[in-house]
Amino acid sequence: RVAQIGKEAGIPDGVLNVLPGYGDVGEALGRHKDVDAVSFTGSTEVGGYFLKYASESNLKPVALEMGGKSPFIVLEDAKINDDLIDNAINSAFWNGGQNCSANMRQIVHKKVKDEFLDKVIKKVKKLKVGDPLDLKSNMGSMISKGHLQTVDGYIQKGIDEGAKLLSGGVSNNRQKGFYAKPTLFDGLKE
């Protein structure tokens, strides 16, 4: 659908191509001399391959987003139902957001943004943070005190830069363990 939107926006055929696949697809793109640029989101290891492929072919520009944190994109025709909301929340907060595929950015079309945010905020505020062995907990602790401090630093930066805090915020460290609050912002700067 993203490529279709690009076409509808007037991007000529062949300029924007979305080709999901595995290593052989990426390598073919990275090494092909007629491919003028490549953008990749994924692991640091695979990102390194794209730099190698570019250097061995036509020195094409390579845009890399390595280590994950891919966006969760909600298009204007999306049905804002429980499945979508649950997927949006789980993709961001599963394992405390401590995995490379966590969708820490949610890009939502303005047509459905209010409905989406309303439903997400209501469900996020109900998440129980606590001992991961407690079946009533939805989100466990950060891996270490240092990681919690890093997460709190990012949250504070969002607040300081004027993003609208919708839920959560900097942890209060009143619980035993390194528990971050499930936090939502709107209007973050790049």
Question: Predicted segment positions?
Answer:
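Short, well-ordered alpha-helices that flank and scaffold nucleotide-derived cofactor binding pockets
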Residues: 4, 8, 31, 52
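PLP-dependent aminotransferase-like
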Residues: 1-26
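Glycine-enriched alpha-helix->loop->beta-strand junction motifs that scaffold or abut catalytic
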Residues: 32-38
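ALDH superfamily catalytic-core signature
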Residues: 37, 45-190
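Beta-loop-alpha module in the N-terminal Rossmann-like domain of NAD(P)-dependent dehydrogenases
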Residues: 20-28, 42-49
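A short, aliphatic-rich alpha-helical micro-motif
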Residues: 30-32, 174
